[in-house]
Curated annotation (Swiss-Prot):
Function: Arginine attenuator peptide (AAP) that has a regulatory role in the production of arginine-specific carbamoyl phosphate synthetase. Encoded by an upstream open reading frame (uORF) within the 5'-leader region of arginine-specific carbamoyl phosphate synthetase small chain (CPA1) mRNA, it attenuates the translation of the downstream CPA1 ORF. In the presence of high concentrations of arginine, ribosomes translating the uORF encoding AAP stall at the termination codon, resulting in reduced translation from the downstream CPA1 initiation codon.
Biological process annotations from GO: regulation of translation
A molecular function (GO) term: translation regulator activity
Designated name of the protein: Arginine attenuator peptide
Outcome reported for the amino acid change (mutating residue 13 to N): Eliminates arginine-specific stalling of ribosomes at the termination codon
Keywords from the named record: Leader peptide
InterPro entries reported for this sequence: Leader_Arg2_CPA1
Cellular component terms (Gene Ontology): cytosol
Family stated for the protein in its record: Belongs to the arginine attenuator peptide family.
C-alpha cells in the first residue's frame, strides 16, 4: 500500500488510473 499524502499521487492520477483500469477490461 501507499500513502496518498506521502507521494506525488494526486486525486487526478488516482481517477485516471482507475478509469484506465476499468476501461482496460
Amino acid at each position: 500500500m501507499f500513502s496518498l499524502s506521502n507521494s506525488q499521487y494526486t486525486c487526478q492520477d488516482y481517477i485516471s488510473d482507475h478509469i484506465w483500469k476499468t476501461s482496460s477490461h
